[in-house]
Amino acid sequence: MWFSCATTSSILFVAAVVLASAPQGNTESICTLSDSETCAVESLTSPSADGSVLVYPGGDTRCAFDNYQDSTTGFTTNSTYFFQVFPNTNLDKSKLLIFFQGGGGCTDDNTCAFGLECSLAENALFTTVATVRGAGVIDRFMMDNMFKDWNVVFVPYCTGDVHVGNKVLPPFESGFEQQLGNPQCLGKNLPMHMNGYNNSKAALGWALQNFPDVENLVVGGASAGSLGAQFFSSHIAEMWDVDAKGTRFSIMADSYVGVLPDSRPLPVLLEYFGACDNGRPFPADVAAICGDGNASTTEVVEALIEDKPDTNWLFINSKGDDVQRYYYALVKESIQGYPFPNLMSEEDLYRNMSAILEAYQAVSPRITTFYVEGDHHVFLMEKNFTSYKSDKDLLLGDVINEWLSSNSSLNLDTVSAEIEIAPKTSGTTL
C-alpha cells in the first residue's frame, strides 16, 4: 500500500533525521534574553560539556507548530526556539563561524501541514523541534577540526522553510493523511509558522552585538542550511559591513545546490515561504529576481555572488546526493508522488548541479567546488568530515584549510603544496 517502503522512506527523510538530536544541556548552559539580560558572550562562563551555551531569544522566534506530543508514534513538536553559542575560551573575537542547521523541508500546503507531518511520524519531512548536534565543524574536541577555536553561532532549524520563511499557513488537511493510519494526528487545527527568517534574525542580531569586528567571518550550512547560508550571504555581509572593515567573508555550502524542476523553480518556493520581500533576507535587486516566478536558482544566487564580489565560496556535494534527488521529486510531484519510483539519476543530478556551479564560477573567481563520488548527504556535520576525499583524491580537511588560509586577495593562479588551484577565470574545482 502507500508508504509501504521503509527503505525509501528512510532515504527520503534522512535530512530531517540525521541532522538533529536533542540537546544535552543543564541550567548552567542556558541563557534567556530579556530586558535585563543580554546574554553577553563575556557572561557565558559556564558552558555545557560540549563547550556551548543555549541562548533563548524569545520575542518573535518560534518553531513551526505549537507544542504537541503523540503518545502513539512519539512525534513531537515544540514551539520554543533557541540558538547555540560556542564561545572561544580565551574570548578571542577575531574569528566567527555562523552555521545554519539542516533538517529537511516542505514545499506546499500538503507537505507543510501539521496533519501530514504528524502522520508521517518518524519520517516527517522536516524537524519540528529546535535541536543541536555536537559533531563536525562544531566539535570543540576534534583535533583536526579547523574551527575548534573559533567562536561559533549555530542556528537550529525547525520551520521547514530553509531558514528564510516569513508566513503563517492556516491548518490544512488534504485527505492523504488518512491513508497513513494515525487518526490521532488529524483535526488538531494547528497552523504552520514559517518563521525561519525571524529565528535567523535573532541569532544573527545577537552574533553581531557580541562579535561586531571579526577579522574572519565564515557562514556555513548543511542541507537546508546550505541554502540558508547562501540566501543570507549578502544580508550578513551588510550587517557586518565586511567591505568597509576589510573582513574576510566566506560562504561554505554543504550538500544543497538547488537543482529544481522547471515547473517549480526556486523563486516560486521562496515566494511560497514569504521570503521575497526586500530585506528578508535579500537586497532589493535580488528580491526583485526572487519575485520573478520564472527565474532560476542560478539567477538568484548569481545575483547574491555579484552583490558581494569579494566573498569566497565553497560548495561541497556528492555527485549523486540521494536527498537532493528526492527533494527534487518532492518539489515536482508533492507527496502524491511517493515513493518516487522514477528519481532523477545520479548522473543527471551531477550534470545539473555542475552546470549551476560552473555558472557561478563564470561570474566570480572565488568559487571553489568539492565533489565526492557517491550519494552521501552532508559532510560538515560528520565526526570525520576532514577525511572525505574528492573525486580528485583531495582531503576535505586539506581543502578547507587552504581555503581559509587564503587572504581576501586570494590568487587562484597559485598552486599550493597539496592542492592545485584552477585558473582565475574559472573558479576552483577540487
Feature map (PLM): residue ranges:
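Cleavable N-terminal signal peptides of Sec/SRP-targeted secreted and luminal proteins
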Residues: 4-22, 27
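C-terminal His-loop and adjacent cap/lid subdomain of alpha/beta-hydrolase
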Residues: 23-430
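A positional/structural detector of protein chain ends, strongest at the extreme C-terminus
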Residues: 1-4, 428-430
